[in-house]
């Protein structure tokens, strides 16, 4: 029993380590994206100024901006809109404007609203920030988010389901036997309850509890429970 428990805990520890590494990489990538966006905005400003004076932008400025765009595209998918004045606008995610002319916005790494120890990426606005992790794709950032979403999370949930299933089957078999005193066998493993995580920013006072009726009904999915106008909805987190 101790050997099995240690093995499962070892797998969980490896997944946690991978999660932490992705957190650090996302923080670093967000900083790099912001630096590139700032460079593009500055080059836009110089291109606009030079074009207004000479009628065309110098090739070296255009080449420098193209290099910055290539660096940005290596990290995240973008869409580009070229302006008549020589500037370009850069959009990410679901159309969030990362660069508008000579203004650059910011991509920030912030705690996940359900799991504060996990980093998500948000687009900073004048009124706060908007989580855009689910809409970002491509490049190194898209790869990190995909690794978390498609590899780490399913593996962790599958590991949990495996652990619960093994524990329940073992406990059931153990209960069918008797101990040295002739008493019915008890549970061999203690199985934890279902974890419910409150979202950051909740303004209600409702509390939720989930009861597990058997491992056969478990899935590898996470679910979001929301309340609106007195009605509750449950949907898959992905």
Language-model region placement:
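Structural signature of extracellular appendage/secretion-system components
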Residues: 1-238
């Amino acid at each position: 029993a101790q050997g099995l428990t240690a093995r499962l805990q070892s797998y969980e520890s490896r997944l946690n380590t991978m999660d932490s590494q992705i957190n650090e990489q996302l923080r670093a990538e967000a900083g790099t994206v912001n630096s590139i966006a700032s460079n593009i905005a500055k080059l836009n400003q110089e291109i606009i100024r030079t074009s207004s004076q000479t009628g065309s932008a110098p090739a070296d400025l255009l080449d420098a901006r193209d290099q910055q765009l290539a660096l940005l595209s290596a990290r995240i998918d973008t869409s580009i809109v070229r302006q008549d004045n020589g500037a370009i606008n850069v959009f990410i995610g679901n159309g969030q404007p990362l660069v508008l002319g000579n203004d650059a916005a910011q991509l920030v790494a912030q705690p996940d609203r359900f799991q504060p120890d996990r980093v998500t990426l948000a687009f900073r606005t004048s009124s706060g920030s908007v989580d855009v992790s689910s809409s970002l794709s491509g490049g190194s950032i898209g790869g990190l988010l995909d690794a978390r979403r498609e590899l780490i999370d399913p593996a962790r949930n599958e590991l949990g389901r495996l652990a619960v299933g093994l524990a329940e089957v073992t406990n059931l078999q153990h209960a069918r036997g008797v101990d040295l005193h002739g008493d019915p066998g008890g549970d061999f493993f203690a199985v934890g309850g279902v974890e419910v995580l409150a979202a950051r920013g909740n303004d209600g006072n409702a509390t939720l509890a989930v009861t597990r009726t058997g491992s056969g009904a478990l899935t590898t999915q996470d679910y979001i429970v929301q309340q609106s106008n007195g009605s509750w909805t449950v949907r898959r987190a992905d």
